[in-house]
Amino acid sequence: MTITLPEVRMTMPARPEGVAVVRQALAGMADAMDFDAAVVADMKMAVSEACTNVVVHAYDDSAGILEVDIRAEEEALTIVVRDHGTGIQPRPIRRDVPALGLGLPLIAALSDSFELRGSAGQGTEVRMTFAYSRGDDAADVRVDGRWNPEPN
């Protein structure tokens, strides 16, 4: 018997009202999969931050697209938020260094793993994973596909 794990794919205009749509879809899927309420709250906060970054930063004065994939895997739920906008120059995400923006460090702190990919003019992809059962270990943080040398 083959079990098909749920997957949700959304593509919408990168507008503020889309953030709530993504958050509700994620909450519904996570609740149906019996995630702990505290983990669902972390997921919703992290996905809100990632989507808000797209709405605020990805597109220079023009309409753009927000893409979100939510996929159940054997041991975790993976959420990918991407845009095709101005891009970001990835750099190590450090939780101990104050920065103007708190979104990416917050996503890294809330998720069990975090990966940031992007380049100038090519858009940005934020991938975060939430394990079904959580340990006490800090999140694995990758920047542009490589382990972050200074995740803490």
Q: What are these regions, as identified by a protein language model?
A:
Residues 1-9, 109-152:
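Flexible, glycine-/charge-rich segments associated with ATP-binding catalytic modules
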Residues 20, 24-48:
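Conserved short strand/loop->alpha-helix "switch" segment adjacent to the catalytic nucleotide/phosphoryl-transfer site
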Residues 49-53:
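Conserved polar catalytic motif of the HATPase_c/GHKL fold
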Residues 54-58:
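Short helix-loop "hinge" at the ATP-lid/N-box region of the Bergerat-fold HATPase_c
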Residues 65-75:
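Short beta-strand/loop element within the Bergerat-fold HATPase_c
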Residues 76-101, 145-148:
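Glycine-rich/acidic phosphate-handling loop/turn and adjacent ATP-lid/helix
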